[in-house]
């Protein structure tokens, strides 16, 4: 039986693909971080950060999910103007929303282009 939290992460990735963050199941008090930002929290900070990346995003492809309880670890690819970037992201789900997201990827394709 598939962990229902995988569907929540898939909805998140679908929102990125559609470039419609209003569809992302993200908690108002979300905590997030990745190699391009310091640990941050709150839907406003998350929306500002992710909105800045959306223009460079061409597609999103989920490759694999590993789920246990409230956590989902997802390997996905961001097809961007800088090339395809593999991302491994840890999600913690609470009451149907993403409460925490930590992405791990090599930022050099992005930082070297600036």
Where are these regions (language model features)?
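Alpha-helix initiation/capping motif
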Residues: 1-2, 39
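Short acidic-aromatic low-complexity motifs
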Residues: 2-28
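A beta-strand edge to alpha-helix "cap/lid" segment located at domain peripheries
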Residues: 7, 17, 33, 44-114
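Short N-terminal helix-initiation segments at or just after the protein's N-terminus
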Residues: 15, 34-39
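Short beta-edge strand/loop motif at the mouth of beta-sheet-based domains
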Residues: 28, 38-48
């Amino acid at each position: 039986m598939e962990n229902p939290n995988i569907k929540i992460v898939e909805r998140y990735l679908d929102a990125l693909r559609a470039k419609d963050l209003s569809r992302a199941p993200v908690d108002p008090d979300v905590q997030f971080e990745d190699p391009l930002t310091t640990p941050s929290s709150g839907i406003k900070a998350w929306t500002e950060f992710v909105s800045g990346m959306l223009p460079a995003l061409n597609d999103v492809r989920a490759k694999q999910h590993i789920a246990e309880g409230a956590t989902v670890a997802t390997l996905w690819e961001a097809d961007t103007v800088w090339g395809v970037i593999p991302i491994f992201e840890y999600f913690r789900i609470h009451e149907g929303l993403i409460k925490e997201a930590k992405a791990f990827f090599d930022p050099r394709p992005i930082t070297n282009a600036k």
